[in-house]
Amino acid sequence: MKRITIILRLVWKYLQYYWRAETRYGLHSPFLYELVEKTVEDTRNFYAFSIIEGLRNLLLRDDTQITIADHGAGSKVTGSSRRAVHSLARHTAVSPATGRFLFRLVHFTKPTTLLELGTSLGISTAYQAAAARKARFITIEGCPETAALAQQHFEQLNLPNVQLLAGTFQEKLPEALRKLKRLDYFEQCLQFAHSGSVFVIADIHWSAEMENAWREMCRHPKVSLSADLFHIGLLFFRKEQREKEHFTIIRSVLKPWRMGFFD
């Protein structure tokens, strides 16, 4: 019953999002228009996609049981502390569409440093690291056995730029911030944000608490531009942006009557 309630809530939230969402043709920010054009609207297949999805397919068939230590706000799928790898791959890894978006976002912004809180099996990490092989990438995972698997995956995918820190965010985040110095828990990271930083927040509509947290982050005075893509949210700190703006964005193919033909 709880799972059905969650699904129904997400469907309702998506309908609300869909009603509000603008395509790129309704955006007033030139920067955001270009970003959407080269990330949300881009349909090209890059070399890394098939390799990473090949790994995902292997994980979806992996019956190995591992012990899960969940230090986060709670797993999306409740159950025993022993989980099969295929269950983790199905329920905690980013979708192929989100992975491709993250790759394009990193490819567009060209960061020199990246920090990820929550590695899981490393699918999200792999998409981002593959788009910026010269960037320094630190990812933190609280579950030791999951972290060990993710490290194996980074080695298989030849991603030497990824440094995985195994431990809780409380333990490892200060260490990561000291190592990164200038960064490409919101308040802790905020002091390291600069004009070119992008914060990517996952699952912003998953629960009322996460929606409230997302709204609070959008309202923060240091955030100059925010974008709701439903599955994730983007926060920017562009000093050249004089007025604070927020946009709810959807691919133009999903709202064909908002493609600019009748403007």
Enumerate the predicted regions with their spans.
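A short alpha-helical cap/connector motif
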Residues: 1-195, 205-263
